[in-house]
Amino acid sequence: MKVVSYLKGIPGSNKNPEKPEVLKRFVQGVQVHGDVGIAHDGLYTPSDVAVLQGYVHEDSPHTPHLQLRKQVLDEQAKRNRRTIIVDSNLFLYLDKQNTKRYLRYSMDGVFPTTGNYFSDNPDPKRWLKVSQDLGIRTREWRTQGNHILICLQRNGGWSMKGLDN
């Protein structure tokens, strides 16, 4: 199996060492298991699995790193090959340096209808660990009394799938 991670899919202005590190370590893991792993610093090259740090949306700017991400996703899909997308920790606002190294991994997309988050068999204790690590407190769902549930996301977030906010 040939796995290629795309270092040029990271913005040139990036100052976060975690972004290239995760791509390089992914490749190291592939190599340890006897497969071909390449941390690639160029344009698209066919592979069994491509690895991207971050995703590209329909309305994303036409910058070189985002154009490469789009090309990788499109070419891999056209060849019926896989793409792993490594994306940011949803709770970065609580741990700006991501000291616990929480990241999101999906295959072939980031939307519920296009991506696979490998969540068919979730560990029921996982949320307890994440919430304890990051100091997140939630309340049980309440059916008595007057309560309002407000669900928010940033403009252009993935779950809107093109709908206006």
Positions of the model-derived regions?
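Residue-level preference for short coil/turn positions at secondary-structure junctions
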Residues: T45-P46, R79, T143-Q144
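A structural signal for short, well-ordered beta-strand segments and their strand-loop junctions
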Residues: S5-Y6, G37-H40, A50-L52, D74, ...
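Charged/polar, solvent-exposed surface patches and flexible loops
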Residues: R25-Q28, K129, G162
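Short amphipathic alpha-helical segment that frequently serves as the phosphate-/nucleotide-binding helix
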Residues: P17-K24, L66, K70, N165
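N-terminal pre-catalytic "stem/leader" segment of glycosyltransferase-like enzymes
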Residues: M1-D59, G156-G157
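Active-site-proximal region of nucleotide-activated glycan assembly enzymes
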Residues: D59-I136
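Nucleotide-sugar donor-binding and catalytic loop/hinge architecture
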Residues: M1, L128-I148
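Conserved catalytic-core segment of nucleotide-activated headgroup transferases in glycan assembly
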Residues: R142-N165
